[in-house]
From Swiss-Prot:
It comes from the Archaea. Belongs to the SMC family. RAD50 subfamily. SUPFAM superfamilies: P-loop containing nucleoside triphosphate hydrolases, Rad50 coiled-coil Zn hook. The two conserved Cys that bind zinc constitute the zinc-hook, which separates the large intramolecular coiled coil regions. The 2 Cys residues coordinate one molecule of zinc with the help of the 2 Cys residues of the zinc-hook of another Rad50 molecule, thereby forming a V-shaped homodimer. Residues 241-344, 390-429, 462-727 form a coiled coil. The keyword Hydrolase applies. HAMAP family: RAD50 (MF_00449). NCBIfam families: PRK03918.1. Zn(2+) binds at residues 441, 444. This is DNA double-strand break repair Rad50 ATPase. InterPro entries: AAA+_ATPase, P-loop_NTPase, Rad50/SbcC_AAA, Rad50_ATPase_archaeal, Zn_hook_RAD50. ATP binds at residues 12, 32-38, 137, 788-793. Homodimer. Forms a heterotetramer composed of two Mre11 subunits and two Rad50 subunits.
């Protein structure tokens, strides 16, 4: 992979930055907090942003520039002769990856964050990029943390974790095959007596078939005998059923005869009663003609009274409503005529207010802008945690100086610990040699007496205790210094991120200092009062105009109301005239006459009811007489039928033999039960036959499976042996690859580290063990542990090892990114790093280095400077 161009917008301090990278060594220089490392983080996010990165604690809110919707990152790079362009737009949550095809860019993935990351991960895995290509700030000495950490990093770079996974998967397969072998062996043992079971079932099958044949031969004879008896019983049952039906028929006829005789008696009695009642009703009906005259007058007066009362009430109520509305309309006409002058005054006042509002509007907008700036400044201040913006630069300078002091102190104490460890080791060796010595002192060469030996041992032991005490004190001081160093670094990181915010606050404060907020506030308040008065007056004038516009409507309504009132009065007069024409002066006189006619009305009602009842009785008499005639005819017919049925019944009873009928029925039942029992037994035998047959087939199938299991067992035993061999080869191959890679990395790292230390150390030694990679330095031809190194030498070793891993990957990966590789290197080692860059890093197609160290420019092909201006990072190409 070679990175050609990076465009970053709204990413931390980068508002809108574009950088082109060239083949060779690209150096990005600038002061702390300028945005150098942020640019490298933007490359990492642009290439690999996914759920995996979010899970590792990197959040959009942390890298999105304050006051923007989201960062935008575009990276153009080349891989294996093909150009790609990746875009991450966090404001719209959009991402794409395109490939240059001729002169046209074409999509190669779906437009989603995860799809783009997956494709790039196939080109260069994320772990390889993070652990070998991109060496992040503060991680140079991470390789020296522990043997386990080194082992993990080496495995990821060499893809040994995949071989380990294959090794583990083969172990799982081996376990499964062993389980299968056990299951096959259990099955073979379980089916050991399969042949005996088959013979037993075949014998049972033959016995069942014989029973089926015996029953099948007897059933036809018994069924024929049953059919003959059934025919005889059927004939006797037909006669028996006929006798039963005739008895039922005779009972029905006698019952019907009794009911008819009872009905005839009821009809004769009812006819006599209705004849008497009809004579009584005829006497009442004779008075009906005279009563009808009185009823006609009664109805006419009642109808008029109801109409009179309803209409008079409606007219009086309507007159009241119309009169009230007329008074209200006349009042509104008077009010509307008085409001025209008020409208003219309001319109003049509104013109004056509008002129003042137009003059104040620019001042109001200026006030609102100032208040927004003030709110933004307060929001930014809250992020500073109480710090004054002007104090941040002073504190940053102090912390950078303190960081350098701590680096020097840590380097000094680390050297001291190394020297003390060596002195301690020397004293321990001297004590061991002294204990072994006989005759001659190994220290001074004099004769060694027991007393002299004891004195020397006491002396060396006291010196050793003193050295150990000094080591513990030095280590305690080192821990204290490193703890303070981490605090200083954390505070530097925090203040660097706050510097942009502080610059924005200062800029806003300068803009606000040029504005008179009190004057603007007074103008704003006057503006609001005028707007409020204007709205009230506009509402009032609209209401007044509406009322004035309705004046003609009110006048027309007044005229119509007067006409309606006259019409209602006329209708009221007409209904009073109708009362007089009927002969009554008042409604009370009319009510008195109606009360006189009510007794005739009641008699009329009684006579009309009697007339209706008489008609009903006469009609009923006619129907009952007809029904009586029909009943006599039906009774004669039923008596004839009774005689006929009685004759037929006597004839059948004479021919029917009840005893013979019962004997035949009993024999038929016994035969049916015998046949049913045989059929049931036959069904059971056939079911058993099928079960035995199925069992035999299953047993034979198990016999086949048993033979197959024996063959599979042989294959599984061969397979498990091959898996064991393959696991052994994978283990050997993994160890071989790891050893070869570590040897090569060791050679490269030895050369670089030796150059760093001017030959003080002739190289390094690497030994691989299970899940560990142990690292030693070679001093005076002897392997020494890493505790032998001073602080600066440890950093040099870490850098040498990280560079060696990247050099090893040349041919597989042609890109290296270093973020601040020199923070703990002294001047001499920084100079050596330049020589190493010239000699070794030029073997890599493209190297990107971020540093605040100006000395590195001498070794770079392309130099880019980043500085902070007005809270935003600015990019400048130096060479």
């Amino acid at each position: 992979m070679k990175i050609e161009r990076v465009i970053v917008q709204n990413f931390r301090s980068h508002k809108n930055s574009e950088i082109e990278f060239k083949p060779g060594i690209n150096l990005i220089i600038g002061q702390n907090g300028a945005g150098k490392s942020s640019l490298l983080d933007a490359i990492l996010v642009g290439l690999y942003w996914s759920k995996r990165m979010r899970l590792r604690g990197l959040k959009k809110d942390e890298f999105t520039r304050t006051g923007t919707r989201g960062a935008i990152i575009e990276i153009t790079f080349e891989e294996d002769g093909t150009k790609y362009k990746v875009l991450r737009d966090f404001a719209r949550n959009v991402s794409y990856l395109k490939r240059l095809d001729g002169r046209e860019w074409r999509h190669v993935t779906e437009t989603s964050m995860e799809s783009v990351s997956s494709f790039i991960d196939r080109i260069i895995p994320y772990n390889v990029f993070l652990n070998a290509i991109y060496v992040r700030q503060g991680q140079i000495d991470a390789i020296l943390e522990s043997d386990e950490t080194r082992d993990k990093i080496v495995k990821e770079i060499l893809n040994l974790d995949k071989l380990e996974k294959a090794y583990d998967n083969l172990g799982k397969i081996r376990k499964y095959i062993k389980y299968s072998i056990e299951e096959k062996e259990k099955f073979i043992m379980k089916t050991e007596n399969i042949e005996d079971l088959i013979r037993t079932q075949e014998k049972s099958f033959t016995e069942v078939l014989n029973e089926i044949r015996n029953i099948s031969s007897n059933l036809p004879r018994l069924r024929r005998e049953l059919e003959g008896i059934k025919e005889e019983v059927k004939t006797l049952e037909a006669t028996f059923n006929s006798i039963t039906e005739l008895k039922l028929r005779l009972g029905e006829l006698n019952g019907k005869k009794g009911r008819l005789e009872e009905r005839i008696r009821q009809l004769e009695s009812g006819i006599e009663e209705k004849r008497k009642k009809s004579k009584e009703l005829e006497e009442v009906v004779k008075e009906l003609p005279e009563l009808e005259k009185k009823e006609t007058e009664y109805r006419r007066l009642i109808e008029f009274k109801d109409e009179y009362l309803v209409k008079k009430n409606e007219l009086e109520k309507r007159l009241g409503i119309l009169s009230n509305r007329l008074q209200e309309v006349k009042r509104k006409i008077k009010d509307a005529e008085s409001k025209v002058a008020r409208i003219r005054w309001i319109e003049e006042r509104l013109k004056e207010i509008q002129e003042k509002i137009m003059k104040l509007e620019p001042r109001v907008r200026e006030f609102e802008d100032a208040m927004r700036l003030k709110a933004q400044m307060e929001s930014l201040k809250s992020k500073l945690g109480g710090l004054e913006p002007e104090k941040i630069n002073e504190k940053l300078l102090y912390l950078e100086n303190r960081k350098k002091e701590l680096e020097e102190e840590i380097d000094k104490i680390t050297r001291k610990i190394g020297e003390l460890n060596q002195r301690s080791k020397d004293r321990r060796l001297a004590i061991i040699e002294l204990k072994k010595a006989r005759g001659k002192c190994p220290v001074c060469g004099r004769e060694l007496t027991e007393e002299h030996k004891a004195d020397l041992l006491r002396k060396y032991s006291l010196e050793l205790s003193s050295i150990e005490k000094e080591i513990q004190e030095a280590k305690a001081l080192e821990r204290q210094l490193r703890a303070e160093f981490r605090k200083v670094e954390n505070e530097l990181s925090r203040l660097s991120s706050l510097k942009t915010i502080a610059d924005q606050i200062i800029e806003i404060r300068e803009r606000l200092s040029k504005i008179n907020l009190e004057d603007l506030k007074r103008d704003k308040e006057e503006y609001e009062l005028l707007k409020s008065e204007s709205n009230k007056l506009k509402g009032e004038v609209e209401s007044l105009k509406k009322e004035v516009n309705e004046l003609n409507d009110y006048k027309n309504e007044s005229t119509k109301l007067e006409i309606e009132i006259d019409k209602a009065k006329k209708e009221l007069s007409e209904i009073e005239d109708r009362l007089l024409r009927l002969g009554f002066k008042t409604i009370d006189e009319l009510s008195g006459r109606i009360r006189e006619l009510e007794k005739f009305h009641n008699k009329y009602i009684e006579a009309k009811n009697a007339e209706k009842e008489l008609r009903d009785i006469l009609e009923s008499l006619k129907d009952e007489r007809e029904e009586l005639d029909k009943a006599f005819e039906e009774l004669a017919k039923i008596e004839t039928d009774i005689e006929k049925v009685t004759s037929q019944l006597n004839e059948l009873q004479r021919k029917f033999d009840q005893k013979k009928y019962e004997e035949k029925r009993e024999k038929m039942m016994k035969l049916s039960m015998e046949i049913k029992g045989l059929e049931t037994k036959l069904e059971e035998l056939e079911r058993r036959r099928d079960e035995i047959k199925s069992t035999i087939e299953k047993l034979k199938e198990e016999r086949k499976e048993r033979e197959s299991a024996k063959m599979e067992l042989e294959k599984l035993n061969i397979a498990i042996k091959r898996i064991e061999e393959l696991r052994g080869k994978i283990k050997e191959y993994k160890a071989l690859i790891k050893e070869e890679a570590l040897n090569k990395i060791g050679e490269i790292a030895s050369e670089i580290f030796s150059e760093f230390t001017d030959g003080k150390y002739s190289g390094i030694a690497i030994r691989a063990e299970d899940n560990k990679v142990k690292l030693f330095v070679i001093y005076d031809g002897v392997e020494r542990p890493l505790t032998f190194l001073s602080g600066g030498e440890r950093i040099a070793l870490g850098l040498a090892f990280r560079l060696a891993m990247s050099m090893y990957l040349i041919g597989k990966v042609d890109l290296l990114i270093l973020d601040e590789p020199t923070p703990f290197l002294d001047e001499e080692r920084r100079r050596k790093l330049i020589e190493i860059m010239e000699r070794h890093l030029r073997k890599i197609s493209q190297v990107i280095i971020v540093s605040h160290d100006e000395e590195l420019k001498d070794a770079a092909d392309h130099v880019i400077r980043i500085r902070l201006e007005g809270g935003a990072s600015k990019v400048e190409v130096v060479s």
